[in-house]
Amino acid sequence: RTLSLLCGQLRIPKKELWCIVAGKPIRFGLNEFHHITGLNIDDLPTEKFEPEADYKAFFSELRVPTGEGPNLDELRQGLVTCRAWPTEKRRWFGLLTLLSIGLFGLHTNSRIPFESAKRVFDDEAMKTYPWGRAAYEALVVSIKLLRPIGKTYTVGGLVFVLQAWAYESIITIAERFGNAVNADEIPLLRWGGSRTRSTIESVIAEDIKANGGE
């Protein structure tokens, strides 16, 4: 279902998505991302940030190239030695892994943005950084570069937001395939997963026919 939405995109220059569903456009932008996730979408800071903690030594221990954030392969290698680390270093390691897998949804050789990775080493910076905007921009870039091959495709980023967006935006999809596990949660946590081979076009066509349309 999500692929049907992504393949129906309008070509626009802005950092947002517009998709055609049943002949009508629906929008996926920064505000929609915030509504679904509840994450901070303030502007990304432009000033240089340097944490007091010696992050360079930590990255060097993980064999991360100078001036870059770690990738998942490097973090996996760190699993071998992290058990012997002090609590603070294990916490840094865990947060970096969370960013790589949970927030940015990176492939194994893709790196956490350097400016984002450095925030892990400062508690206040970690709490106040606009993770929502950073995650949204990474997701949109990945989607705009999408080139499906056959019936397969790979999208990086916080992709579960797209499923929640489809359920929140298209009532027919939510009614047919949505599994609302907690109506009081934010949309990202409200819907359980499901799989189907139906396309959005076929579902909407069936709905129109069932309601007396043509």
At which residue positions do the language-model features occur?
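Structural stabilizers in ordered domains
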Residues: R1-E214
